[in-house]
Amino acid sequence: MFVASEAFPLAKTGGLADVCASLPKALRALGCDVRVLMPGYAQALDRVLRPRVVAELGEVLPGAAVRIIAGSMPDSGVPVWLLDCPSLYRRAGSLYCGPDDADWADNAYRFGLLCQVAARVALGAAGLRWRPDVVHAHDWHGGLVALLTRGAGDARPKTVFTIHNAAFQGNFALDDAARIGLPADALSVDGVEFYGQLSFLKAGARYADRLTTVSPTYAGEIQTAEFGCGLEGLYAARRDQLSGIMNGIDTELWNPATDRWLPQPYSIDDMGGKAGCKAALQQELGLCADARAPLVASVCRLTSQKMSDIVLERLPEQLAQHPRMQFALHGRGDRALEQGFDALAAQYPRRVAVRIGYDETLAHRIHAGADILLHGARFEPCGLTQLYAMRYGTIPIVRRVGGLADSVVDLDTLAPHSEDATGFVFDAPTGDAMSEALRRCVNLHDARPGVWSALCRLAMARDSSWSRSARAYLDLYAALTPRRRVEASDEARGAAAALARADAASGRRRRAPEQSERLRQERLARQVALASK
C-alpha cells in the first residue's frame, strides 16, 4: 500500500505525484497488488474513476469523521483509496497552502490523520477486505505510519519510507503530537523530536524497516551535513537500511509518438514532428517564429533550490550574447522570483515568455517544443523534468548533483563510450558555471545542426522507464517479507519473465536495424564530443 499526499492525475504539485502514480502502475505490471491511499481532495474526488464508499471509520481523531472512498486511477486503473474528510481536504487553495500561499496551520493534523488511517488499514482495523504486506510511505506526509504500527507485533506489516526531498521535513509544534495520537514515549530526541519540534520526516527515517531515496547519489548526499538538513547523523546510522533507487517516468504517458497534447507526433526514428512542435510552441507563447533560434526552457518550481535566482540574474547577459536565443519558463514558487521573471518577459517581448502556474498539458508541449532544458539545482534528489526532456529529444543542462548526476552524461566527460552522451553538466552552483554550460550547448546547437540532431536521438534512446527501478523495489519488498511474499513474489517474477521473453522476441525481430542505427549514432556521438571542445 502506497501512502502519499498526491498522485497524478488526481492531485499534483510536483514530481512526487508523478512517482506515486507511475511506480504503482509499473509494479502492477510485475504482478504486485498495489493500492494508493491519499487524501480526498475535491479535485481527486472529481477525477477518480468509479468512486464508491467502502468504509465508514467515524472519528479517527477528535473532530475528524472519516470515510474511505475507493476508485481507480484514470488511464492506469491502479486502485486508489481516498480519505474523505471534507473539513480538512476540500478547501480553496492548494494541497498544502491556503489562497494566500501560507501553509495550512493544521497540516500536522491533516497528514497525521492520513497516517492514522493508513495504520488502521495496515493492521486490518478499517473494515476493508484487504491488508498490505508492505506499507510504502512517501515523504514527510506519510512519515508517522511506521511509528503508529510499531507495537502490533507479528500483525504489523513491513514498512518502507521514501525520502523524496530531505529539505521538506514536516516539522510542527511538539504539542501537536497528542492531538494526532502519537505515543508519549516517542516524543524524545531518540524518537520524533527534532530541535524542540515534532518531525514527521524524522519519524519515517527513524522507525521504517527500510529507507529509500530517489537516486543513488542522493542516498549518499543526505548522509552529509551539506544535504542532510540536520538529520544526516540518522541517515548515516541507518546506511545499511538505506537504498538509492532512481526514479523512472511513465513512458506511455510521456511518449512524443503518442502524446495527445502535442500538435504533431514524432519519434527517435522520425524527428520531423519536433520542428512542428517548436513552431506551435513559439506561436502559443508569443515568441518570434524562428526555426533556427535556440529555444531554452525551464519547467520547475521557482525557488533558490532550482537556482531560479541565478537564472533570473544571468539571463539578460545570455540573451545579449546569443541574439537569437529564446527563453520559455513555466512554473510557480517564490513571489519575488515570479515577479522578476514577469518583468524580464516584459523587457524582452517575443524572446522571453513566462507562464506562472502549472498546466500539465503545457508542460508536455514545452518539453517537446524546446531545444534545450535549463535545470540548475543547488540540490536535487532526483529530478524528473530532465528525464521528460531527454524522452522528447530536448537536451538538458543540469548541475552535477543528486539524480541529475545519475541521469545526464556530459559531452566533455565521456569515457570511454560516447554513445552515452545525453546533455551538458556543470559542477558549481554559480552563475559562471551555469552560463558556461549554456554557452557550450547553444554553440553546438547553432554550429553543428547535424551533430545536434544525433545528440537529441542519443538522449531519446536513454531508458528512463520504471522497468529496472520497479524490479528493485519489488526485490526490496520481497526481502522484507520472505515468508509472506514467496508466492506473490514468484507470480511477480513470472510476469517479469514473460515480459522479458516478449522483449527478447521483439528485440530479435528488430536487431539488425537497431544495431545499424546504434553504430551510426556512435559515429555521430564521437563528432558531438569533438564539436563541443
From Swiss-Prot:
Entry's Gene Ontology BP terms: glycogen biosynthetic process
Biased composition (Basic and acidic residues): 512-525
Gene Ontology CC: cytosol
Protein residues bound to ADP-alpha-D-glucose: K12
Keywords: Glycogen biosynthesis, Glycosyltransferase, Transferase
Record GO terms (molecular function): alpha-1,4-glucan glucosyltransferase (ADP-glucose donor) activity; alpha-1,4-glucan glucosyltransferase (UDP-glucose donor) activity
Region Disordered, residue ranges: 497-533
Pfam family, one: Glycos_transf_1
Pathway in which this enzyme or protein is active: Glycan biosynthesis; glycogen biosynthesis
InterPro entries in UniProt: Glyco_trans_1 (IPR001296), GS/SS (IPR011835), Starch_synth_cat_dom (IPR013534)
The protein's Enzyme Commission number: 2.4.1.21
Catalytic activity: [(1->4)-alpha-D-glucosyl](n) + ADP-alpha-D-glucose = [(1->4)-alpha-D-glucosyl](n+1) + ADP + H(+)
Lineage: superkingdom: Bacteria
Coiled coil: none
Family named by the database record: Belongs to the glycosyltransferase 1 family. Bacterial/plant glycogen synthase subfamily.
PANTHER family: ALPHA AMYLASE DOMAIN-CONTAINING PROTEIN, GRANULE-BOUND STARCH SYNTHASE 1, CHLOROPLASTIC/AMYLOPLASTIC
Function: Synthesizes alpha-1,4-glucan chains using ADP-glucose.
Designated name of the protein: Glycogen synthase
The encoding gene: glgA
